[in-house]
Amino acid sequence: MTTHQIRQKYLDFFSARGHEILASASLLPENDPTTLFTGSGMQPMIPYLLGEKHPKGTRLTDSQKCFRSQDVEEVGDNRHTTFFEMLGNWSLGDYFKKEQIPWLFEFLTKEIGLDPNRLFVTCFRGNDSLGIPRDTEAAELWKKEFESEMGNGKWEMESHDIKVVDFPERDGLQGGRIFYYDEKKNWWSRSGEPDKMPAGEPGGPDSEVFWDFGDKLRLHEESRWKDSLCHPNCDCGRFLEIGNSVFMEYRKRV
């Protein structure tokens, strides 16, 4: 399957679900002094996520051209590049997690044909000091999606194997399928973690999907992280992030 086919499948998938297809915004952001270049699909959507009405409605989808100069030092591994297109679907006060997560799972497994046995997901652990709760809703929705694959002849695990791991960066995979991380890994804003966000900046927890290249390639064992436990956000390269759902629920106060 080519990149063009994947792009078209994505846009068609969400168009069939009531989304208007948008053209890619400029790589040079308009009315956004926070960055030199458009570095994510989220960036051009910020005004509308803050309440401005979009002329195309409340359900939108696009393939946004992105440039990340900060990733130039990472080019050469199996996960980073400086220029890419980011596929996105946007809900402006319309649907939320209970629609987004099943749709993403359906697109990856049915439209693209990825093996669900190789998919692993992460959710936000929460931060008590900031009053931001653990995203148990996203974790439960993901669990239901994985459970829905049972009985189709392809799923290699049992229901009790859809395990949720609380501290994978400390404890490793632990046979898990769903993993909680803190705001260093599962939070999105243009500025990064909540303590780096300026007043007025929107942000929120996210839920990421990773593809597992498997242990047979020995990517972890032959990396410089071999003496630590592997997990979805390990830098060894065994796991590749292929999707991210951001839930923009917060705005930084003064």
Named regions from a protein language model:
Residues M1-V254:
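Structured aminoacyl-transfer and RNA-binding surfaces used for tRNA recognition/handling
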